Amino acid sequence: MASLLGVLCGWGTRPEEQQYEMIRAAAPPSEAEPRLQEALAVVNALLPAPITLDDALESLDDTRRLVKARALARTYHACMVNLERLARHHPGLEGSTIDGAVAAHRDKMRRLADTCMATILQMYMSVGAADKSADVLVSQAIRSMAESDVVMEDVAIAERALGLSTSALAGGTRTAGLGATEAPPGPTRAQAPEVASVPVTHAGDRSPVRPGPVPPADPTPDPRHRTSAPKRQASSTEAPLLLA
């Protein structure tokens, strides 16, 4: 009877209430926070209005946009470094054989840097930043960077343009610095005695005009041996006269 009254009056056991967790604000994982901060620093250096970490983590699309902008910003900085190095090359003064390659790479770097900058500004500053055109531009820029081996190729050309390579350039000159070339080395010391020894060997057959130091080893015969030869001939002619 009591149980019946309890059921009718609602005195029975109540079901447990559901537990709800508070939704926290978007926060990056602890291992990914340094990379996101570095990406923000690189991207904000190119944006007129900087963005915050909360703006980047507001949605998944914004996070992906930050990752793509970071790749574009790194590509942009690599292009600017290569342009700065290639600008030190003076056409016609040092290694004329690489003037065409330097000019071609300079145009390619400038075009790629402008593409990266325009894409970053479109992703964050334009109204229609959520369309797929930004993804296409990002893919094209990254593909262009990978296919042409811009980093390795431009470093090699910049080293040759700045004279950092030890190999000699065409024309027999070696680049010594920015806009200066070093002439080929002159005759060494070992070649000078050979030129001076030619008249010495020919002049040994005749008596010198003025006294000078006698060389230690003279290949010419001694003059005393030449004077003794007529004496031996004279003694041979006098021998028959004495016998007669």
From Swiss-Prot:
<dbReference type="Pfam" id="PF04540">
    <property type="entry name" value="Herpes_UL51"/>
</dbReference>
<keyword id="KW-0920">Virion tegument</keyword>
<protein>
    <recommendedName>
        <fullName>Tegument protein UL51</fullName>
    </recommendedName>
</protein>
<feature type="compositionally biased region" description="Pro residues">
    <location>
        <begin position="210"/>
        <end position="220"/>
    </location>
</feature>
<comment type="similarity">
    <text>Belongs to the herpesviridae UL51 family.</text>
</comment>
<comment type="subunit">
    <text>Oligomerizes. Interacts with UL7; this interaction mediates UL7 incorporation to virions.</text>
</comment>
<keyword id="KW-0564">Palmitate</keyword>
<feature type="region of interest" description="Disordered">
    <location>
        <begin position="175"/>
        <end position="244"/>
    </location>
</feature>
<keyword id="KW-0449">Lipoprotein</keyword>
<keyword id="KW-0946">Virion</keyword>
<keyword id="KW-0597">Phosphoprotein</keyword>
<dbReference type="GO" id="GO:0044177">
    <property type="term" value="C:host cell Golgi apparatus"/>
</dbReference>
<comment type="function">
    <text>Plays several roles during the time course of infection, including egress of virus particles from the perinuclear space and secondary envelopment of cytoplasmic capsids that bud into specific trans-Golgi network (TGN)-derived membranes.</text>
</comment>
<dbReference type="InterPro" id="IPR007625">
    <property type="entry name" value="Herpes_UL51"/>
</dbReference>
<keyword id="KW-1035">Host cytoplasm</keyword>
<feature type="lipid moiety-binding region" description="S-palmitoyl cysteine; by host">
    <location>
        <position position="9"/>
    </location>
</feature>
<keyword id="KW-1040">Host Golgi apparatus</keyword>
<dbReference type="GO" id="GO:0019033">
    <property type="term" value="C:viral tegument"/>
</dbReference>
